[in-house]
Amino acid sequence: MDEGGGMARRAGRALVLLGAVLLLARNVLWYAQTELPALQEVLADVLQRGPEGALSGEVGRLKTYELLGDVLIDAYLLCATVLAPLLLRGGGERALGPLAAHLLGFSLPIIRRVALTRTRGLLMALGVAALLAGAALLAGRRPRGGSVPARYGRAAGDVATLGLAFLSGVYLYTACCVVANEFYAPGMAVVAGQMGHAVDRAWVALRLAHFVAASALSLLVGVERPGSGWEAGRGRVALRAVGCAALAVLMLRGIAEHYRYYILLPRLQQVTICLCALCLVGEALERVGSRLDGEASRAAPEGEAG
């Protein structure tokens, strides 16, 4: 490895660790400033009035479910943040790109909601930016060898991989909003009635299950897409992409039709379908390219022998 490449890798590893530290600092700050006081208030209400009494009023229910939603979101962010240095240590640097894209998709709505002038919003933005920069430095340059279909197939697969990882983060935040708004908060029933539908908790639970499956599949596409020699994935990626597309479209179409005020979901659905189609095209091009490269490598010794 040349000196420039070694410096880039060291800088990339440092940026990944810095991003993880910043995101952990944001989690600790948010817990100390928001969740701990809310937890103390809810526990005091439960001790004073009992669980049924504390949850009997509208305000009590909303406080409890708000706290539950915040804890779930922060727990997920904590797990994803800890995963970054673990991948770095375990040699899974190739998976850092999809992980950073996934965290970007999840955190963008939070960063927009929490202004960058606030410390926790700034820490999250800087942490995600450092992770992205570190993952880009560690990825380095792709090998330029091989036939034209193989090169274009690798490029299409990379774009689809990062796009699906990003959208899986958006799906996660959307699902958290759907569950928090429709499943827990009683006040949303009034809004739902005004929009011409009733809150269907079984439906929300089913959409959440669709989301979990779609996110898992899209992350698998990102983590396991390339082989050790950048060869084609022999259909595994294409199969996962099709499954991811089917589940994501089911979830997004159902939510968009049932809850009209999630206006962004139809557009996300279209982008998801396009990315999964791009993933399939990239897989096909890589297979064609690997076949052409194999034929060319076999023909070269025969030409030399002749």
Regions found by a protein language model. Give the residues of each.
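Alpha-helical transmembrane segments and immediately adjacent membrane-interfacial amphipathic helices
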Residues: R9-A38, K63-P143, G153-A189, G193-G227, ...
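Membrane-interfacial, low-structure loops and terminal tails that flank and connect transmembrane helices
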Residues: D2, P143-V159, W230-E231, G294-G306
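Short, Lys/Arg-rich, polar N-terminal cytosolic tail immediately upstream
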Residues: M1-M7
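Serine/proline-rich low-complexity intrinsically disordered segments, especially terminal tails, linkers
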Residues: L55-G60, V170, G254-I255, L292, ...
